[in-house]
Amino acid sequence: MTEKYLSVYRKKVPAIDNEIEVYTRPVVDLQMRLGLMDRFPDVLQILTVAKVPLEKFVGPKDAVELARIANDELAELLVKYPNKFFGAAACLPMNDIDATLEEADRAIGKLGLQGVQIYSRIAGEPLDLPKFKPLYEKMAGYNLPIWLHPETNPALDMDRGIFSWPYETTAAMLRLVQSGIFYEYPALKFIVHHAGAMVPFFADRLKWFASATKLFTQNDPKIYEQFLNFYVDTALYGNTPALQCAYEYYGAGHILFGTDAPLGPRWGMIEGTIRSIERMAITEAEKEKIFSGNAIELFKMAL
């Protein structure tokens, strides 16, 4: 959370402190974060605003103001620390879709950010509602990704996200596939966390349900293949067998190096995640794609 963004957010919604108190200090302390990053000089980060969706706490007017502040600060950090931060995903005021489209244009076209971030539900509403389609059309036009972060589900979060977040991610992926959005916008790209959540593990189950039931509304017996449009990260706390499962499903070309830093144990398990990729039974060229090549191509960046 950037400095001015958090300061303004706190004034508008004092309860925000209850949400961020479980986070580690590097989420809000830039100098501590930079110091920790010095331990991994070969690792660059893509910045996103920490998980407190604007639409969850503030109305549309305040959400627009806060999103603009956050994105301005993200862009400033990219300029100030080019050897630390590789890019950033824009924060959006999703409770005002017209303002969301304007801010996406400003963040990408003017500020030079590399995509946008949304959540698995928008103020409790699913992502396949028609009112969100203009954002998907816009991002497909930019050929830049949408980061999809799981939202908190009060009915499931007694585990503080251990299993509820992968479920939230998977449910959102399913609704997007069922909606046929990837048929409509073939260039649309989503990045989901935790190696694709439940999808790789249940790949054959998905295939069976798609062919044998009416779960999928699109008239395509191979609609399950649309799950392969997602990109996934490696944030599994160093679990090589799970990464291998994701690789067997997605292939190396849709896996991006990612951790929970600056959250999680040992500062996001950066070292453990690196080791887990190095232990995978894949070629060195494929490992290089996961570590950096896919990101460079997807975000249209150069090191």
Language-model features, listed with the residues they occupy:
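Mid-to-C-terminal alpha-helical segments outside catalytic/metal-binding sites
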Residues: 1-44, 72-79, 102-106, 114, ...
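Acidic-and-aromatic substrate-binding clefts and catalytic sites of carbohydrate-active enzymes
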Residues: 23-28, 55, 93-100, 123-130, ...
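Active-site gating/metal-coordination segments in enzymes
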Residues: 49-175, 179
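Histidine-centered divalent metal-coordination motifs
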Residues: 1-2, 149, 194
